[in-house]
């Protein structure tokens, strides 16, 4: 598989559509924090972020002592990573490549991260195989994936007929249960549990955020005092953490199968 087989023209505009209401802002912020916190559980080493986007998480990890590598097939997104690198003064190495064919040696990476990008890949199984190949036996693979069968999507489908008949229909710029056309598969809890195939074993998983983009929720939060809105979002997030099947985003942590067998 080569760059010719994938979309290499991805832009931020493809992702950041519509107004950034408090529920979406919290989801992005909290997912970023959880990814950084999960990687930072290991001693600093070499971290590769595949589908790295703007590389904001990598910049934070580089400042914590990690050797940070941003991998993305899109020249535009690598340009955004370059801007992040210049703004933060962090050492982040930029690599143009695809997740299905990582340009790293076997067992040469301590952590492989993939935040909100796997459902854009042409072949998710090929990526998981590559991640297992390049990660050390003591390393981990951390993936965040949008959950299209969480509480938000279920409520969205339930409320949609009412929303269409009322002024609430304008409150969601994209119905939260509809899979965007640039996604290659539907993310949900059963799919996440099966991602590892024969290469990686699921170590743990947790959820991030509840109710993001449910009709009217973000607009209601925007009208509340900031402290109250933040408190509601945090309470919902605490519930989501222990119930990934309910959550808006699922974060999963994987270990190589051989390492998992050795420790059992």
Q: How would you name each of these model-derived features?
A:
Residues 54-101:
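Class I SAM-dependent methyltransferase SAM/SAH-binding core
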Residues 125-137:
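A short glycine-rich, Lys/Arg-flanked "PGG" loop and its adjoining helix->strand segment in the class I
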Residues 1-53, 56, 60, 77-80, 142-169, ...:
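Conserved class I S-adenosyl-L-methionine
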Residues 174-191:
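Acceptor-substrate binding/catalytic loop of class I
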Residues 163, 190, 194, 204-264:
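A C-terminal cap/extension of S-adenosyl-L-methionine-dependent methyltransferases
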Residues 113:
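A conserved beta-strand element that flanks and buttresses the S-adenosyl-L-methionine
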């Amino acid at each position: 598989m080569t760059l010719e087989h994938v979309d290499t023209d991805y832009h931020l505009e493809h992702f950041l559509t519509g107004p950034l209401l408090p529920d979406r802002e919290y989801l992005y912020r909290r997912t970023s924090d959880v990814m950084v916190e999960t990687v930072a559980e290991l001693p600093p080493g070499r971290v590769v972020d595949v589908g790295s986007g703007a590389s904001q998480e990598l910049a934070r990890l580089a400042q914590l002592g990690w050797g940070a590598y941003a991998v993305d097939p899109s020249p535009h997104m690598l340009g955004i990573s370059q801007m992040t690198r210049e703004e933060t003064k962090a050492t982040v190495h930029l690599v143009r490549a695809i997740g299905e064919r990582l340009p790293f040696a076997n067992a040469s990476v301590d952590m492989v991260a993939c935040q909100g990008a796997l459902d854009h890949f042409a072949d998710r199984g090929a990526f998981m195989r590559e991640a297992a190949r390049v990660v050390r036996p003591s390393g981990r693979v951390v993936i965040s994936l949008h959950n299209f069968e969480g509480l938000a999507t279920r409520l969205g489908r339930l409320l949609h007929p009412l929303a269409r008949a009322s002024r609430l229909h304008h409150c969601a710029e994209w119905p939260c249960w509809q899979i965007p056309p640039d996604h290659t598969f539907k993310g949900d809890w059963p799919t996440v549990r099966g991602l590892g195939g024969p290469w990686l074993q699921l170590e743990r998983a947790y959820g991030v955020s509840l109710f993001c983009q449910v009709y009217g929720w973000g607009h209601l939060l925007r009208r509340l005092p900031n402290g109250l809105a933040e408190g509601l979002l945090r309470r919902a997030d605490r519930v989501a953490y222990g119930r990934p099947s309910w959550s808006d985003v699922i974060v999963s942590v994987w270990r190589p199968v051989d390492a998992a067998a050795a420790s059992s």
